Amino acid sequence: MFALRTAARPAARSVGATRNYATLREIEMRLKSIKNIEKITNTMKIVASTKLGKAQRAMATSKVYNEASEKVFENSETAVPENIEKRLWVVVSSDKGLCGSIHSQLARTVRRKLLDFESGEKLIDIVAVGEKIKAQLGRSNPEQMRLSFGGTGKEAPTFEEAAHIADEILALDTQYDDIEIVYNKVLSGISFEPIMKESYSAKAIEDAPKFGQYELEDDVVKNLADFSLANTIYAAMAEGHAAEISARRNAMDNASKNASDMINKYSILYNRTRQAVITNELVDIITGASSLE
């Protein structure tokens, strides 16, 4: 009977030891996975930090042209027409993710403003620049989507890209009384805000009080309106790109910090579990030695 009891104890201890070893392996695998994630997020943060300088320089360059254009319209007292029949919003985003809530916040702002502006059967048409905003607004407002453009966000935008988008918009069969650009404006290194910027139509320029003092040819007014649209889109794309890169850097920085915290917690848990395994093994050895005495 004594022999049966001593034989049963090692079997029970063996099950406990096996469970501890299995837990230890699980923790070790989880720890390895989190460390790999931390390496990836750290690398992405470094890449974003490197790209941010180029994006900020592109934003500064675009602002120089855009501010000069805005000054012309400000001095000429150009204003939005009072009776607007057709509106178009050009929503500027990009194709890339892993940058926090920057795309979803822009989409929420557009949806909210659409509810504020629309009345009756009149719908505001939308042009989506970037696959992210196209996907979000395409699900909620598919009937308002007129055009969409992909391939944005990989590099700092250029005026040629903005001019191509403007040409496609102007080639639409609808004559819009008002065109506004919706994009993310950089407030600081860690914050941004979706805003709307006006792009004046040829009619708005013709009706401006101080432009009316000059005899301008129709081609001049049209070219000025077309250039203004391309210029405004370019400025929005450049600033939106800088906001996105900054948001991605911050998101990857937060992810790296969270991964580091998890690594510390799992390291402590791993060491405690390992210590428990060693302690159990020592208990088994001592118990076995005592039973042989």
UniProtKB/Swiss-Prot annotation:
The name this protein goes by in its record: ATP synthase subunit gamma, mitochondrial
Q: Which CDD domains match?
A: F1-ATPase_gamma
Against InterPro entries, the record matches this protein to: ATP_synth_F1_ATPase_gsu, ATP_synth_F1_gsu, ATP_synth_F1_gsu_CS
Which proteins does it associate with, and in what oligomeric form? F-type ATP synthases have 2 components, the catalytic core F(1) and the membrane-embedded component F(0), linked together by a central stalk and a peripheral stalk. The central stalk, also called rotor shaft, is often seen as part of F(1). The peripheral stalk is seen as part of F(0). F(0) contains the membrane channel next to the rotor. F-type ATP synthases form dimers but each monomer functions independently in ATP generation.
Q: Name one GO biological process term.
A: proton motive force-driven ATP synthesis
Classification via Gene3D superfamilies: 3.40.1380.10, ATP synthase, gamma subunit, helix hairpin domain (1.10.287.80)
**Superkingdom of the source species:** Eukaryota
Could you tell me one molecular function GO term of this UniProt entry? proton-transporting ATPase activity, rotational mechanism
Q: How does it sit in the membrane?
A: Peripheral membrane protein
SUPFAM superfamilies under this entry? ATP synthase (F1-ATPase), gamma subunit
Q: What does the record give as the function of this protein?
A: Mitochondrial membrane ATP synthase (F(1)F(0) ATP synthase or Complex V) produces ATP from ADP in the presence of a proton gradient across the membrane which is generated by electron transport complexes of the respiratory chain. F-type ATP synthases consist of two structural domains, F(1) - containing the extramembraneous catalytic core, and F(0) - containing the membrane proton channel, linked together by a central stalk and a peripheral stalk.
Main location class:
mitochondrion
Name of encoding gene: ATP3
Gene Ontology CC terms, in alphabetical order = mitochondrial inner membrane; proton-transporting ATP synthase complex
The chain's transit peptide is found over 1-21
Disulphide bridges: none
* Entry keyword set: ATP synthesis, CF(1), Hydrogen ion transport, Ion transport, Membrane, Mitochondrion, Mitochondrion inner membrane, Transit peptide, Transport
Localization terms from the record: Mitochondrion inner membrane
Tell me the protein family, please: Belongs to the ATPase gamma chain family.
